[in-house]
């Protein structure tokens, strides 16, 4: 934002303002504020053959994710078929495998960069920097046909997708425990294995595949249980709505320097989750405000912030909101840390 615009913006501190007597933002948006799942990814020293067979011993030493759940939340009905994934890494690649339980393996699409989720599919969403900008999506069906794209930001913030991005150096293979497109028999599952080179998802000269780094990651499985739909959306960690393009709700992928099978690291959450959830509640409230009145607001009272919301934050925290008609910047200073979490109208997240 330009300085002239910033100088005209209103600055409001939540702890000095009157707030409305209502349920509050955290309750209003609680379904979209669940704590994301996390995964600690260990190194592999084996040479990985990407054939979909998962024969390498290290795959069995890699931790398995939890079973996928409904995209709308943990309290929604359990998916009919089970899906789990595993991850590994080395200096060149992020390795992903998934096993999708499936009694009838079907895949009709054969051309790259068609809308693969019109078939049953498996999808990977990656944001190596965690800022919600310029993230990556890779989809494939049971034929191994790929749809890969990059998005400058989420659709909710006016984002654009770039199908021209073909993940350079991607290796991907599938295998079937059953038969493809044969309706009269009963299949068991199909398997995906892929290797994503770090150079394909690197924004600068620094390799994001590094012990201690934390990416944002999610998996999705689109399943057509009946012809004509609606489709089922089963995911590793739920976004709280039928929308995968909410990078703030993706899981945390933490890279360990340990080799898979040689010890374990505990996940270290990079954020104070109370402050993080507060920030994104403000973001969602601003989206609704703009949808209602055609403009953002600098008033936290208008957005619906309550004393109960504020009380969830660490002692010494404060909230700031700057807004013009079509832009906003929300921030939460996390008490006792000196860190400020910031998000703007584009969904760009920063820690200052």
Predicted segments with their positions:
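Structural preference for beta-rich elements and adjacent junctions enriched in aromatics
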Residues: 21-291, 324-327, 338-340
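Short, glycine/small-hydrophobic-rich surface segments
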Residues: 281, 286-311
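In a subset of proteins, long, contiguous C-terminal domains/tails are tracked
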Residues: 2, 13, 256, 347-348
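A short, surface-exposed beta-strand/turn
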Residues: 337-352
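Bacterial Sec-dependent N-terminal signal peptides
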Residues: 1-24
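Exposed beta-strand-loop-beta-strand "reactive/processing" segments of non-cytosolic proteins
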Residues: 307-336
């Amino acid at each position: 934002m330009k300085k002239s615009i910033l100088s005209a913006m209103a600055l409001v501190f939540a702890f000095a303002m009157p707030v409305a007597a209502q349920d509050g933002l955290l309750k209003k948006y609680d379904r979209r504020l669940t704590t994301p799942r996390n995964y600690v990814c260990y190194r592999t020293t084996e040479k990985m053959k990407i054939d979909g067979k998962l024969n390498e011993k290290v795959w069995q030493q890699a931790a398995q994710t939890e079973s996928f759940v409904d995209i709308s939340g943990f309290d929604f009905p359990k998916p009919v078929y089970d899906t789990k994934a595993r991850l590994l890494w080395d200096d060149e690649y992020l390795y992903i495998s998934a096993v999708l339980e499936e009694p009838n393996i079907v895949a009709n699409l054969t051309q790259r960069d068609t809308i693969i989720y019109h078939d049953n599919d498996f999808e990977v969403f990656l944001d190596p920097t965690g800022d919600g900008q310029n993230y990556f999506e890779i989809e494939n069906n049971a034929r191994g046909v790929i749809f890969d794209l990059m998005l400058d930001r989420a659709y909710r913030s006016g984002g654009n997708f770039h199908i021209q991005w073909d993940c350079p150096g991607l290796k991907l293979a599938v295998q079937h425990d059953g038969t493809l497109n044969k309706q009269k028999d009963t299949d068991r599952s199909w398997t995906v294995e892929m290797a994503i080179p770090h150079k394909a998802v690197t924004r600068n000269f620094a390799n994001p595949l590094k012990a201690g780094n934390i990416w944002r990651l999610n998996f999705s499985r689109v399943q057509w249980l009946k012809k004509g739909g609606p489709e089922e959306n089963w995911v590793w960690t739920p976004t709280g709505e039928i929308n995968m393009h909410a990078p703030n709700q993706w899981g945390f992928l933490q890279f360990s320097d340990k080799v898979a099978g040689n010890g374990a690291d505990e996940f270290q959450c990079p954020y104070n989750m109370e402050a993080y959830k507060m920030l994104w509640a403000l973001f969602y409230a601003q989206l609704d405000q703009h949808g209602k009145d055609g403009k953002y607001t600098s008033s936290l009272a208008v957005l619906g912030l309550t004393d109960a919301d504020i009380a969830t934050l660490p002692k010494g925290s404060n909230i700031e909101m700057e807004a013009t008609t079509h832009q906003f910047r929300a921030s939460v200073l996390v008490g006792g840390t000196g860190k400020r979490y910031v998000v703007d109208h584009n969904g760009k997240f920063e820690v200052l």
